[in-house]
């Protein structure tokens, strides 16, 4: 029972719409009506500016990061294969990612999983996050597309999990990669059409 409570709480924390709250509270803007219409960090930068964008990014990362430690804080007993699986920090963090992307508060239409996924990886393996960040910013430097950089970093995580034989990481990163591709479908189409806006700060 406690495991279910932990997973639901992880989802609800992940579903907290940081970008929407910051936009309405300080800018009187519903960011869903601007830019890409997304509530995540990238659109927050675009619509609300850098300071607000950094705050939203931090909050979205923190949502994923904190949930990784729930198995340590909740009185759960992993005495079987199933309970052990669902008390793994990556699995608990995945529920936060799902909450971020499909928030119950916003009719299941939220962010694109990037920042919250980064928070989960930070909590589980900071070195892995550093490697993925290097890949992300390298691709961003070359192509100037945040969407493309996010997808390539996620796929790199899948490849890395295969190399190190971490099959829970493989499952989670595989699910996140699929979600990322689905959520960035319109971005991918615009890239092929040459219509996707490029960043100008790098």
Curated annotation (Swiss-Prot):
Keyword set, alphabetical order? Cell membrane, Lipid biosynthesis, Lipid metabolism, Membrane, Phospholipid biosynthesis, Phospholipid metabolism, Transferase, Transmembrane, Transmembrane helix
One GO location term (cellular component)? plasma membrane
InterPro entries referenced in this protein's UniProt entry, alphabetically: G3P_acylTferase_PlsY (IPR003811)
Keyword Iron-sulfur belongs to the record: no
Keyword Disulfide bond assigned to the entry: answer is no
Q: How does it sit in the membrane?
A: Multi-pass membrane protein
Q: Name one Pfam family in it.
A: G3P_acyltransf
Q: Show the catalytic activity.
A: an acyl phosphate + sn-glycerol 3-phosphate = a 1-acyl-sn-glycero-3-phosphate + phosphate
According to UniProt, this protein's pathway is: Lipid metabolism; phospholipid metabolism
Query: Which domain of life, per UniProt?
Result: Bacteria
Q: What class of enzyme is it?
A: transferase
Residue ranges of the TM segments: 2-22, 54-74, 81-101, 120-140, 162-182
EC numbers: 2.3.1.275
Give the record's GO biological process terms.
phospholipid biosynthetic process
Q: Where in the cell is it found?
A: Cell membrane
Q: Which GO terms describe its molecular function?
A: acyl-phosphate glycerol-3-phosphate acyltransferase activity
Q: Which NCBIfam families match?
A: glycerol-3-phosphate 1-O-acyltransferase PlsY
Q: Which PANTHER family match?
A: GLYCEROL-3-PHOSPHATE ACYLTRANSFERASE-RELATED (PTHR30309:SF0), INNER MEMBRANE PROTEIN YGIH (PTHR30309)
Instruction: Give the record's family classification.
Output: Belongs to the PlsY family.
Subunit info here reads: Probably interacts with PlsX.
Briefly, what is this protein's role? Catalyzes the transfer of an acyl group from acyl-phosphate (acyl-PO(4)) to glycerol-3-phosphate (G3P) to form lysophosphatidic acid (LPA). This enzyme utilizes acyl-phosphate as fatty acyl donor, but not acyl-CoA or acyl-ACP.
Its recorded name reads Glycerol-3-phosphate acyltransferase
């Amino acid at each position: 029972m406690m495991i279910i409570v932990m997973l639901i709480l992880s989802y609800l924390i992940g579903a907290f719409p940081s970008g929407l709250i910051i936009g309405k509270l300080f800018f009187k803007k519903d960011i869903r009506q601007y830019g890409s219409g997304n509530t995540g960090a990238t659109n927050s930068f675009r619509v609300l500016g850098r300071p607000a964008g950094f705050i939203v990014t931090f909050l979205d990362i923190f949502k994923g990061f904190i949930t990784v430690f729930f198995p340590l804080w909740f009185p759960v007993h992993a005495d079987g294969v199933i309970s052990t699986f669902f008390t793994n920090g990556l699995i608990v963090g995945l529920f936060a990612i799902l909450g971020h992307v499909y928030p119950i508060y916003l009719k299941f239409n939220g962010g694109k999983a990037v920042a919250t996924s980064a928070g989960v990886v930070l909590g589980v393996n900071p070195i892995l996050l550093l490697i993925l960040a290097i890949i992300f910013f390298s691709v961003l430097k070359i192509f100037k597309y945040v969407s493309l950089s996010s997808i390539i970093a996620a796929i790199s995580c899948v490849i890395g999990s295969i190399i190190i034989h971490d099959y829970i990481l493989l499952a989670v990163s595989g699910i996140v990669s699929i979600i990322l591709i689905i959520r960035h479908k319109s971005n991918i189409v615009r890239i092929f059409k040459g219509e996707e806006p490029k960043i100008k700060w790098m």
